[in-house]
């Protein structure tokens, strides 16, 4: 007979910067000016699916762990495709820019320049 398995996956993808990946000299200050060169925005955690909230919506037949893993991997790819958009990366960059600008102004710098390292389409630094 026909076997069916429908699972609902929940997750939170967090986009941001990892300062551990900043290159040497990423922040340069001179008098009242500072230039901050941030690492590229990326997905901060690959374990974004909340397994505890995953539910089987409809299940009939017998399913192996491998079958469930295939569905899990498909859910991961779908979430990544929907969330890692140029628009969301741009929003995350703007948030990082705003936070660093506020921080540098509060420290006392008057002129603040925030830049991001460039990456290729796969997210590797150029």
Question: What positions do the PLM features span?
Answer:
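Domain-level marker for long, solvent-exposed, non-transmembrane regions
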Residues: 1-126
């Amino acid at each position: 007979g026909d076997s069916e398995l429908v699972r609902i996956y929940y997750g939170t993808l967090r986009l941001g910067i990892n300062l551990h990946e900043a290159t040497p000299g990423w922040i340069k200050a001179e008098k009242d000016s500072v230039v901050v060169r941030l690492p590229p925005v990326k997905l901060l955690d690959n374990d974004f699916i909340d397994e505890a909230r995953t539910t089987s919506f409809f299940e009939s037949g017998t399913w192996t762990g491998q079958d469930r893993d295939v569905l899990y991997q498909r859910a991961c790819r779908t979430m990544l495709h929907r969330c890692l958009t140029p628009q969301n990366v741009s929003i995350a960059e703007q948030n990082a820019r705003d936070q660093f600008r506020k921080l540098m102004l509060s420290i006392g710098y008057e002129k603040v320049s925030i830049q991001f390292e460039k990456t290729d389409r796969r997210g590797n630094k150029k």
